């Protein structure tokens, strides 16, 4: 799976006695080649009446196009995350314009966490951890360790994982945006 430079997006879900906690976060760095052009970008957001969390890695304009299309699919399928993701991927693979978009999405709701790629993949990683972008592997490793060995909330795990990724990945900064369900 191709990883795009310039960001880290991580989502964590944790089962607690009070219910499922879901959080997603991303850094704010935008690069153009080897130059940082913005440090405060917002790459994660809530969709579908605040019931779905989404983040992107890749070309910003492409990602916003995908967010719009994905939200339309969520509306069409009454918020069913997996169905909307599959339908978006079908369009992404078959539409001439969409096929050229260079971005990946990480999405989550109360029942599932998914990675959506332009290669036609809708992936549901194990353990409720989703990570994309150049710092994704660092954040994923940190989240896995924290999820397994601590009682931290999903939001706290996302924040700490982003901080660790920011220390290791030159394309990830320390300005983080985190959303929770």
Curated annotation (Swiss-Prot):
Species per Swiss-Prot/TrEMBL record: Delftia acidovorans (strain DSM 14801 / SPH-1)
Reaction catalysis annotation: ATP-dependent cleavage of peptide bonds with broad specificity
NCBIfam families: ATP_dep_HslV (TIGR03692), PRK05456.1 (NF003964)
Family (UniProt): Belongs to the peptidase T1B family. HslV subfamily.
EC number: 3.4.25.2
Primary role: Protease subunit of a proteasome-like degradation complex believed to be a general protein degrading machinery.
PROSITE patterns for this protein: PROTEASOME_BETA_2 (PS51476)
Positions of the catalytic residues: 7
Protein name, per record: ATP-dependent protease subunit HslV
Positions bound to Na(+): 166, 169, 172
Cross-referenced InterPro entries: ATP-dep_Prtase_HsIV_su, Ntn_hydrolases_N, Proteasome_sua/b, Proteasome_suB-type
Keyword Repressor: no
């Amino acid at each position: 799976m191709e990883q795009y430079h310039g960001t880290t997006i991580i989502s964590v879900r944790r089962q607690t006695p009070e219910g499922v906690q879901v959080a997603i976060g991303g850094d704010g760095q935008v690069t153009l080649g080897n130059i940082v052009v913005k440090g405060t970008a917002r790459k994660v957001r809530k969709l579908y009446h605040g019931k779905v969390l989404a983040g992107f890695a890749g070309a910003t304009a492409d990602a916003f196009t995908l967010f719009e299309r994905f939200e339309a699919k969520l509306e069409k399928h009454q918020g069913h995350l997996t169905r909307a993701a599959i339908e978006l991927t079908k369009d992404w693979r078959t539409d001439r314009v969409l096929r050229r978009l260079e971005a990946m999405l990480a999405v989550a709701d109360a029942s599932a966490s998914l990675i959506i790629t332009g290669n036609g993949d809708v992936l549901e990683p194990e353990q409720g951890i989703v990570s994309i972008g150049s710092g994704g592997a660092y954040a994923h490793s940190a989240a896995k360790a924290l999820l397994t060995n601590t009682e931290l909330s999903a939001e706290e795990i996302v924040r700490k994982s982003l901080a660790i990724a920011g220390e290791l990945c030159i394309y990830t900064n320390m300005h983080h945006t985190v959303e929770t369900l």
